[in-house]
């Protein structure tokens, strides 16, 4: 059984990334996000263990860090799904991301509670 250190939250945010191999910006979007990494969807190919620079727009901030591709799945629709592990998230970015993810989880829990009543 797989154990995750950080909770994943399903959210969609724009992503720009540059790979170490091909350093031109490519566009993707998050499928889910955690303090440890992100699952992204892209039209451009990625390779397992590839290093990259990631920018994720979470208004009003942009989270920037280095990352490593942990896995790659090719979907039937031609899109690529990839798991990215964050490698050098700065403390201010980590704190912003933590607060954002907590807020999203709190809002969803509240919405779930209200929909049951």
Q: Language model features by range: what are they?
A:
Residues 1-35, 98-117:
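N-terminal helix initiation/capping motif
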Residues 11, 26, 52, 63-65, ...:
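Hydrophobic core residues within well-ordered beta-strands of beta-rich domains
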Residues 14-19, 50-62:
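Short conserved beta-strand and strand-loop elements enriched in small hydrophobics
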Residues 18, 41-43, 57-59, 70, ...:
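Solvent-exposed residues in well-ordered beta-strands and their adjoining turns
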Residues 30, 67-69:
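Conserved hydrophobic positions within beta-strands
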Residues 34, 71-73, 88-90:
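A generic structural motif
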Residues 38-42, 75-86:
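Short, solvent-exposed secondary-structure boundary/capping segments
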Residues 46-48:
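Short, well-ordered loop/turn sites that connect or cap secondary structure elements
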């Amino acid at each position: 059984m797989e154990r995750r250190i950080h909770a994943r939250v399903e959210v969609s945010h724009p992503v720009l990334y540059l790979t170490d191999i091909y350093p031109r910006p490519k566009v993707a979007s998050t499928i889910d996000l955690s303090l440890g990494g992100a699952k992204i969807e892209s039209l451009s190919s990625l390779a397992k263990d590839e290093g990259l620079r990631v920018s994720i727009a979470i208004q009003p901030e942009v989270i920037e860090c280095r990352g490593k591709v942990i896995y790659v799945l090719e979907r039937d629709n031609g899109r690529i799904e990839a798991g990215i592990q964050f490698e050098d998230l700065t403390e201010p970015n980590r704190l912003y991301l933590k607060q954002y993810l907590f807020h999203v989880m709190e809002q969803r829990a509240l919405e779930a509670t209200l929909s049951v009543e």
